[in-house]
């Protein structure tokens, strides 16, 4: 074991590296540091090797101040978690690296995960069937037919790579499986107890912060580097303390709390910062409540949303069937390291403190387009009418059964909420009371229940609540992300027909964490996040324009009105059900054989070998071009000259706009590519499922049907651009290929919050493969900026107060970016935009290569070439 040996101590049967002893040696009061910073100190303290982690790095973290210096630090997670949408391309890349190593004359076994890596298959199941007892079976059958090639790759990887495990499909959602089973809180490594830390290839990896485990989402490219033993590099963050006081009142849920926190913190601005929760209300928040709050850290913009280890942590570990030895180890270790929170713990120093009173939380939803746009439930009806006119230019008309505001999708989905027994039991109790009063869901509502683990189904069955959910057509449709990530499946044909013919603004209500435009379903423009309890209520109401306080949900068989308050479960009822039916044995039983899979997985045949056998006819898995013509020599980047703008984007362009995860339109470039190869539109599957095929993903870049390219004066959405040399309108992919043929570099112009949303590495990979050399934006979301660097694309930020509009840029200029040759972190570069009439617009931008290692990645053409050269040269 590495580490600063003088701080290694014996505790029982194990050793540890003492954070309090180390901090005291520097005359630093441990209690003054935020808990998350103390965890970072321990992470580096046990990782010091003088090369990847230096003693100076540990000191830099230990000397954290509320306004920290701009200093780069390494982070050495002990685990990596992956889901299959982002995990398949990671495995494809590692397989391609093995091929490249063979071509260089090296040993392919040297390309191997060093860090324990677990992949959970959860992103592929779609809701094709719903509302019946056979929905799960039929959806699973379709999933396996569509994804056989991808699953063969993953099963090959499970056998070919060390330290790599796969949780097969039909088990649960990555973050819930991590919370309920994979996470240890204290991790034994080489006889030394260390903090369980991780990165994940999904932005909601932060959910594990609710268990006191530090971790967050990174791009697939960065995850690969961590898997191969590289640190994750970051700037020492500010830590915003969120003081929680009070107690949730009757009728308010953890979902309402997290939507409020998301609203408050988004307005405050916490991008790139740690958020750490403290205060007396921690005693009243269970780990599932905390996990719900931590899950949505990407939505409020922070790197993480950390809760310290405390008595609630230990209760949850016991309640989920973890070994008593582990629970005791966690308690001893956390107390020895001075990070075990109690109500009497001293308050650390924070960069800023924001207080939130739980007593003020009221029932809420968020929407119709962004998670941070919270609407109190009592104001939703009015808010929807305002949005209808303002956002969609329509006026409400009370016409046929399906109209503006009709709920056509009601989905109990996502690890955000299905991991929380209080809201799941609550949904079951509301369903029970609704059925007992003779209520039903409206016939045009597509209902679904997609638990994040099989434990949920078991306790709903044992409690007798599942039959009531099924009576309202909330049958289990699968164990995966489903509607939350756009795998909502088709709407019934008659519903689709009415929406299209009436050009209707219909709604989805889901218990997920994201509601970006066109994410849930291309025809559903208005999407609201809500607790599972409210999802059931909206399915019964059949519309979002309802005042629940004054309008009935429906009428019983005797014509008596039934209001939401009449069937809303009390906190006492919910607690009683949890205490009776949620037992540790449930978790032990369901996770006993978690890596074995079902009969399909066990019978799935794969060819074994150190290198993967690529199928040239596959439309799912193709060998990527990243290492074509690869050499060990580094060709440093040069200035960009004469670039054209491929895309001019607006504000808040998400990675979902850049690289959609959902359905593939038959008329899109990716759709045409698949049709040319004999794939029927009914077999397209989704973009997310085809991330192992760069040909599909290149064509899918900027192909979201709601993406707007501002090179067009009129509103044009979808995959279109203008090929500037001739003025032709053509697909973004075709234009990029024509520019490439003519040797013309490309850039992208964008507004604020470019690349927000999912940690989607294909948003950067696709951009790079289209030939884009730089993206000039007003601001970048953390993960996407990092991913661009990882793919050798230069993120450039306008100086404060400047943007496309203020500089009067049209996007039709030719651009030079000067000063790249001797680039260094955050260097100011000069941009010259040449107009057709000979005029020049000159302005400065900041190169968002934030750390020295990012400069190295950029010079090598990206993180993968950098790592491959290091491995080949024996430096890793």
Feature roles, as predicted:
Residues 49-244, 256-259, 363-366, 380-381, ...:
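Long, structured ligand/cofactor-binding scaffold of large enzymes
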Residues 189-334, 425-431, 435-443, 475-590, ...:
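Mobile "lid/hinge" segments at catalytic clefts and subdomain interfaces of large enzymes
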Residues 1-142, 285-295, 299-324, 616-659, ...:
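N-terminal amphipathic, basic-rich helices that act as targeting or association modules
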Residues 274, 278-285, 513, 736-780:
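Extracellular/luminal Protease-associated
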Residues 681-694, 698-729, 737-741, 796, ...:
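NTP/phosphate- and nucleic-acid-binding module
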Residues 556-574, 581, 785-857, 875:
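Acidic, glycine-rich flexible loop/linker segments
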Residues 76, 94-149, 277, 282-392, ...:
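Terminal amphipathic helices with adjacent charged low-complexity linkers/tails
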